[in-house]
Amino acid sequence: MTESHDTPITSDGEARPHRRIKSFVMRAGRMTEGQQRGLDQGGPLYILPLADSPVDYDQVFGRSAPRTLEIGFGMGHSLLEMAAAAPEQDFIGVEVHRPGVGALLNGVLTQGLKNLRVYDCDAIEVLNRCVADNSLDRLMLFFPDPWHKARHHKRRIVQLEFAELVRRKLKPGGVFHMATDWEPYAEYMLEVMSAAPGYRNRAADGTYVPRPEERPITKFERRGERLGHGVWDLKFEKVD
């Protein structure tokens, strides 16, 4: 999710404010009964509104605990599994795909989880408007759209500007964890993050970390394994 550098000019010669290029496409999708239940019953309890000032998440969760935010949780399987496995931590998921939000919330209701909240809007807006600086222990970005074609690379969410936004929101020592099943995108993310100031690559060899135990195996990973693809994990720690 990066900014366009083209500034449109109006007919009277004045420059219009440029629009930010989004890294996602809104997809229509039918709701299952369970997904609709999640939205109807879980939405009022667990979907957070987009705020105009930093949110006090200690108040939202009723405690102070290590906090993880995931961007683009898809259908929510991994986030649900991680939240259930770590009840002593708090999790915030951001996803614009409504069936995915419904599926996650249905799981939250079914499992009775209390340590998970959701935003159903643009993650950049959430980070800019709702998340205080130096407040996150971890930010996760698993299997983002790689935008394969060269002309679409500007739509990739991992850009220097985004890396700086994430760095501001992480606590010192906080970790930005990325994963992809497309090697050219892994190489691209490694290049961007290696050039981003204020980070340290946690990989011993300066490339990719071994598959972390805390990241559940996703459908993307299983698909990649069937196709003979690998999965690349990157972990960059905020150092200042």
UniProtKB/Swiss-Prot annotation:
CDD domains xrefs: AdoMet_MTases
One cellular-component annotation, GO: tRNA methyltransferase complex
Disulfide-linked positions: none
Keyword tRNA-binding appears in the UniProt entry: no
Pfam families: Methyltransf_4
Pathway named in the protein's UniProt entry: tRNA modification; N(7)-methylguanine-tRNA biosynthesis
Chain spans, region Disordered: 1-20
Record has Methyltransferase as a keyword: yes
Keywords, alphabetical: Methyltransferase, S-adenosyl-L-methionine, Transferase, tRNA processing
Binding positions for substrate per the UniProt entry: 149, 181, 218-221
Its biological purpose: Catalyzes the formation of N(7)-methylguanine at position 46 (m7G46) in tRNA.
Protein name: tRNA (guanine-N(7)-)-methyltransferase
